[in-house]
Amino acid sequence: MSSKGGSSGGMWSVFIHGHDGSNKGSKTYTSGGGGMWGGGSSSGVKSGVNGGVKSGTGKI
């Protein structure tokens, strides 16, 4: 899965589906889309959404 080029939206979908039933922050992942960079854990949700969006967008 080395698609760091432009299919970021697709990666969000995968993560959203993966965490949709696992964690309660499914909506947060969807809105921020930084869950994948944050780590995916409960503590990584907020840090992923807040920091992952900016750092993630920059890396993309």
Swiss-Prot record:
Compositional bias segments (type: Gly residues): 31-42, 49-60
Taxonomy, superkingdom: Viruses
InterPro entries: Orthopox_C10L
Chain segments carrying region Disordered: 1-60
Keywords, ordered alphabetically: Early protein
Family: Belongs to the orthopoxvirus OPG024 family.
Protein name: OPG024 protein
